[in-house]
Amino acid sequence: GNGASELFLAVVHALKPRNIVIPVPSFYGYEYVAEAAGSYIKYVYLPEENGFRPGRELLQELTADTDMLFVANPNNPTGQLMGREYLQELLEHCRQQGITVVVDECFIEFCESGREQPKFLLGEIGQYENLLLARAFTKSFAMPGVRLGYLVCSNAELREKIRRQLPEWNLSVFAQRAGIACAE
């Protein structure tokens, strides 16, 4: 997509969630797309004493009436990284509640490799049909102004539904070539 933000917008237009949970603090773009979709937003304020790291308070707010959760790993703007065990618990809880989880990993490449292997979600995407994983070349390869992001999802039907929300020619040739060069 033309950056991760365009993909977030395509996701909410494709799925039309009634209720979206957004942890606070978080990237303002989640609120923007939720409002564009006409969704009700439930804000879950993360405790400062825990460094704004999500925990039980977030899980407790994710109930059967929640349709979607937007969460960044690492968090933008705090930089807090969710651990593997917590993420697995979060994804399993959301699966049981029927909640689609959009995990924004646009800053994951900036995490230290020695820390609790932060990039494991990509390898486990097939285990969670309710998981949408977003990343962006813009951040990882220091290409401000080059709008290029991607969304990974194991559910083929859902991928197609989201793709149909994107403009036919949404990527410039420059962005495409830059993405190919970065992938090589």
Residue ranges and their predicted role:
Residues 6, 10-71:
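PLP-dependent aminotransferase-like
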Residues 37, 130-184:
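PLP-dependent aminotransferase class I/II
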Residues 35, 53-65, 77-101, 105-140:
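Active-site pre-lysine segment of PLP-dependent enzymes
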